[in-house]
């Protein structure tokens, strides 16, 4: 039987390649006569490293180039960290599969020269590195005595900057650290009570052409239903708020006894305004749960906070 050829578009960063190679391996293990190849490339977000992510804009920073390859027929699927994939996709493309989630929490990584191992024990004036406005807003709200500094680059580059003495600690996604073998550098898994994680964090999203039934059937073997239900609720929450990857919006989701528990928050950039709420809903209608939570936060003033943030973004670009 002739092998079916499948080409994956991927970012070329170390973490992206680890994730894409995992997808390749799992597909070839589960689908007989499948020949998978990888096309690795740099995205806009990979190339612009001297500007804070929020100042660049967030519409497909890490995905556009991969999507272009699919739309012109040069790739069949694209593997993304789901947190980087916008909730509104280009015409002709869809989120075809969500894989089993790694730990979605944020993690604290401390400089080797320090012996402070938790956020709450960091002394006043400690320099904390993060490129995420979501983390920044929540941590400013909880720890106003700390100093926050932007940090760019891939996971390995950020750890090198930390060890070179530029920061006392940095905040990264626990999932990325674990996938790259840096679990021993995690000093604290940050509780959701302190920092809600990004929408989709810890899961991989596989994007493909909407009408490619053969490819959709192939990638379905990697679908993890509980992860998918949680992430679809999170993405619906973000979409309803009309937020993006670089806006201070955080979530936490769990499934218990057939019920979906979704917590969400919206914060101002300085962390002084923070609105948080939870919705419990039907696990079989995850998007409705996300939409309901977004509506609740809007009623509490989330719209006003987000409008102020977008206005500030526009002023900074001019």
UniProtKB/Swiss-Prot annotation:
The keyword Nucleotide-binding does not apply. GO terms for biological process: chlorophyll biosynthetic process; protoporphyrinogen IX biosynthetic process. Its cofactor is dipyrromethane. Gene3D superfamilies: Periplasmic binding protein-like II (3.40.190.10), Porphobilinogen deaminase, C-terminal domain (3.30.160.40). Its EC number is 2.5.1.61. It comes from the Bacteria. One of its GO terms (cellular component) is cytoplasm. Keywords: Chlorophyll biosynthesis, Porphyrin biosynthesis, Transferase. Pathway: Porphyrin-containing compound metabolism; protoporphyrin-IX biosynthesis; coproporphyrinogen-III from 5-aminolevulinate: step 2/4; Porphyrin-containing compound metabolism; chlorophyll biosynthesis. One of its GO terms (molecular function) is hydroxymethylbilane synthase activity. It is an enzyme of class 2 (transferase). Belongs to the HMBS family. This is Porphobilinogen deaminase. The lineage of its organism: Bacteria, Bacillati, Cyanobacteriota, Cyanophyceae, Synechococcales. The gene is hemC.
């Amino acid at each position: 039987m002739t092998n079916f050829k499948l080409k994956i578009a991927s970012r070329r960063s170390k973490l992206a390649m680890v994730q894409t190679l995992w997808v390749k391996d799992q597909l070839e293990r589960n689908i007989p006569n499948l020949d998978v190849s990888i096309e690795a490339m740099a995205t806009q977000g990979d190339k612009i490293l001297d500007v804070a992510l929020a100042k660049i804009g967030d519409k497909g920073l890490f995905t556009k180039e991969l999507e272009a390859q699919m739309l012109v027929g040069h790739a069949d699927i694209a593997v993304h960290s789901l947190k980087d994939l916008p909730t509104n996709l280009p015409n002709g493309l869809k989120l075809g599969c969500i894989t089993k989630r790694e730990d979605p929490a944020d993690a604290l990584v401390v400089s080797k020269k320090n012996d402070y191992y938790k956020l709450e024990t960091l002394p006043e004036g400690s320099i904390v590195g993060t490129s995420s406005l979501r983390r920044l807003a929540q941590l400013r709200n909880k720890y106003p005595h700390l100093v926050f500094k932007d940090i760019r680059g891939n996971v390995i580059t950020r750890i090198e900057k930390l060890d070179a003495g530029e920061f006392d600690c940095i905040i990264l996604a626990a999932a990325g650290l674990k996938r790259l073998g840096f679990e021993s550098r995690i000093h604290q898994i940050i509780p959701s009570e302190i920092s809600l994680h990004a929408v989709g964090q810890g899961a991989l999203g596989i994007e493909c052409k909407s009408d490619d039934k053969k490819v959709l059937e192939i990638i379905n073997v990697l679908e993890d239903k509980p992860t998918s239900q949680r992430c679809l609720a999170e993405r619906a929450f973000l979409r309803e708020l009309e937020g993006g990857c670089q806006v201070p919006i955080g979530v936490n989701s769990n499934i218990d006894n057939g019920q979906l528990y979704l917590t969400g928050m919206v914060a101002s950039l300085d962390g002084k305004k923070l609105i948080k709420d939870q919705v419990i809903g039907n696990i079989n209608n995850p998007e409705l749960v996300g939409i309901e939570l977004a509506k609740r936060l809007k009623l509490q003033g989330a719209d006003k906070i987000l409008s102020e943030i977008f206005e500030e973004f526009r002023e900074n670009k001019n």
